[in-house]
């Protein structure tokens, strides 16, 4: 059963629209959990030491824009998809930025960093397998 107690309509996110401009804090729609997914309210996330080189284009990592910036971290489940059996809102979880396709292990990417090199990984990062981290920010309505 899908569960989304007090899930805000919007949340704040650090969004990169171009490597020629700095990222901006924007209000964006909060994702709703579908089958096989959850929404995580992030408590803490690491910052990669070479982040500036990624997001200013120095490293030439392929990624779609606009890009919600974020990597691995720890958070609490804010909502669960309709098929969740063990996961419950409020549970503490670790979010790994390394994402693999459920039906194709070669379709892999680093969330918020690199879309990978296969068509499958690009499809996942560009929306076929949406992932967006919801920061621990005050609720927006």
What are these regions (language model features)?
Residues 1-20:
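Eukaryotic N-terminal low-complexity, Ser/Thr- and Lys/Arg-rich leader segments
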Residues 12, 74, 92, 139-141:
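Ordered hydrophobic segments in well-structured contexts
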Residues 21, 50, 85:
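Glycine-centered loop/turn positions within well-structured domains
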Residues 21-29:
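Short glycine/threonine/proline-enriched tight-turn/helix- or strand-capping micro-motif at secondary-structure
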Residues 29-46, 58-125:
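Glycine-rich beta-strand-centered segment in the early N-terminal region that forms part
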Residues 49-56:
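Cytochrome P450 core scaffold surrounding the K-helix E-X-X-R motif
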Residues 126-141:
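A glycine-rich, Thr/Ser-enriched phosphate-binding loop motif common to dinucleotide/cofactor-binding enzymes
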């Amino acid at each position: 059963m899908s569960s989304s107690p007090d899930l805000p309509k919007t949340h704040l996110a650090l969004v990169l629209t171009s490597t020629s401009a700095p990222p901006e804090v924007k209000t964006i729609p909060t994702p709703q959990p579908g089958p096989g997914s959850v929404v995580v309210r992030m408590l803490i996330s690491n910052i990669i030491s070479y982040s500036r080189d990624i997001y200013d284009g120095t490293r030439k990592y392929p990624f779609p824009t606009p890009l919600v910036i974020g990597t691995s971290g720890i958070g609490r489940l804010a909502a669960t998809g309709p098929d969740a059996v063990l996961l419950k809102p409020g549970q503490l979880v670790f979010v790994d930025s390394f994402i693999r396709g459920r039906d194709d292990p070669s379709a892999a990417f680093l969330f918020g960093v690199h879309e990978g090199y296969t068509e499958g990984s690009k499809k996942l990062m560009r929306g076929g397998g949406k992932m967006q981290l919801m920061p621990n920010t005050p609720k927006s309505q």
